[in-house]
Amino acid sequence: MSKIVKVIGREIIDSRGNPTVEAEVHLEGGFVGLAAAPSGASTGSREALELRDGDKSRFLGKGVLKAVAAVNGPIAQAVIGKDAKDQANIDKIMIDLDGTENKSQFGANAILAVSLAAAKAAAASKGMPLYEHIAELNGTPGKFSMPLPMMNIINGGEHADNNVDIQEFMIQPVGAKTLKEAVRIGSEVFHTLAKVLKAKGMSTAVGDEGGYAPNLGSNAEALAVIAEAVKQAGYELGKDVTLAMDCAASEFYKDGKYVLAGEGNKAFTSEEFTHFLEDLTKQYPIVSIEDGLDESDWAGFKYQTEVLGDKIQLVGDDLFVTNTKILKEGIEKGVANSILIKFNQIGSLTETLAAIKMAKDAGYTAVISHRSGETEDATIADLAVGTAAGQIKTGSMSRSDRVAKYNQLIRIEEALGDRAPFNGLKEVKGQ
């Protein structure tokens, strides 16, 4: 039995210099799992709660000592002696003990760190890589694929101090034959984009997710400079590289209107903003749009799905917050056709796997995602491969908190070879 003998929680620092929770789970036989919780900037209102101390004298109120105390106290007491291989039971014990709908007693950051650390320790005790253990937990042993990356090379919105309203402009190296080649194409376009921006006298400082964060004349200009970079890098837009956007529209939804401050405070209704996006998809090969409307604008989302849903992938992030109850409602109402998967929106590995399964069973795609506040923890790489999710969103080609995930994917691809196909654009809904 992979019995848990010790659990340690500690406060560490994330990629934004804010504290987060790290957990260590020790098993009989000396096996250890180590995992850290990420943290978002543009968060959905229905996400599981990230517990912060609120003590302004430490880390400006962002300390996580309460969550760490939960790991070292009640959580440790509850899971010590339990079998780490029984992930569903470990997660259920913590969720039941917390006793709240949104994990506000211990914090999703505490529960998630222990959940992932337990999975890593269990994988070690079985003598297998984490992705292989995840595939077994998922009920799909031995079924793997390498995800198509969505690389966020221009950051706006809450991820950058610039005038760009749309939060992420991404490239997908769909012409690649392997994940490793996709990373190379992404890197070449990223570096070429720096040249394009410099030639225009624009900033090449990077945002939270490692993409450039220049001030631009409009949101469409972000697409134009990326298109120029793709061409200059020697690739064909639409064939070798496609585009994706995360609007994070909740962040610019004010009094029932979508207000683009970077475009002279232009205001749109749900229908108008849908057609604004539709026009962009006619000008550029955009194959995926995330959170194209506010998380509460379900009528608008239904309309957007009717207009765009058969042509492109419409991903719900703040809309669904990796929550099966909310996703189920979305599936029943025909809202969006894809879900963004973020561990810490729901707060445990078991619930994350349930959301991926529900999406796939309904014909929705699942995009595995980082958060804007990350650590060197690369678990999402193993999650993407182990669930054969097909797509991953883990930032740009800079900042080691982002690159850690790409490097882990490169290692996994090397280990699995033909057992983990890279399916490229075929993974994207509507393509």
UniProtKB/Swiss-Prot annotation:
Subunit record text: Component of the RNA degradosome, a multiprotein complex involved in RNA processing and mRNA degradation.
The name this protein goes by in its record: Enolase
Residues engaged in binding (2R)-2-phosphoglycerate: 167, 342, 371-372, 393
Residues forming the catalytic site: 209 (proton donor), 342 (proton acceptor)
Keyword hit for Lyase: yes
GO cellular component: cell surface; extracellular region; phosphopyruvate hydratase complex
Localization: Cytoplasm; Secreted; Cell surface
Cited InterPro entries: Enolase, Enolase-like_C_sf, Enolase-like_N, Enolase_C, Enolase_CS, Enolase_N
Cofactor note: Binds a second Mg(2+) ion via substrate during catalysis.
Cofactor(s) listed in the protein's UniProt record: Mg(2+)
Catalyzed chemical reaction(s): (2R)-2-phosphoglycerate = phosphoenolpyruvate + H2O
GO molecular function, one term: magnesium ion binding
The family this protein is said to belong to: Belongs to the enolase family.
Enzyme Commission code(s) on record: 4.2.1.11
GO terms, biological process: glycolytic process
Binding site for Mg(2+): 246, 290, 317
Alphabetical UniProt keywords: Cytoplasm, Glycolysis, Lyase, Magnesium, Metal-binding, Secreted
Xref: NCBIfam families: eno
Stored PROSITE patterns: ENOLASE
Biological pathway: Carbohydrate degradation; glycolysis; pyruvate from D-glyceraldehyde 3-phosphate: step 4/5
Function: Catalyzes the reversible conversion of 2-phosphoglycerate (2-PG) into phosphoenolpyruvate (PEP). It is essential for the degradation of carbohydrates via glycolysis.
Main localisation: cytoplasm
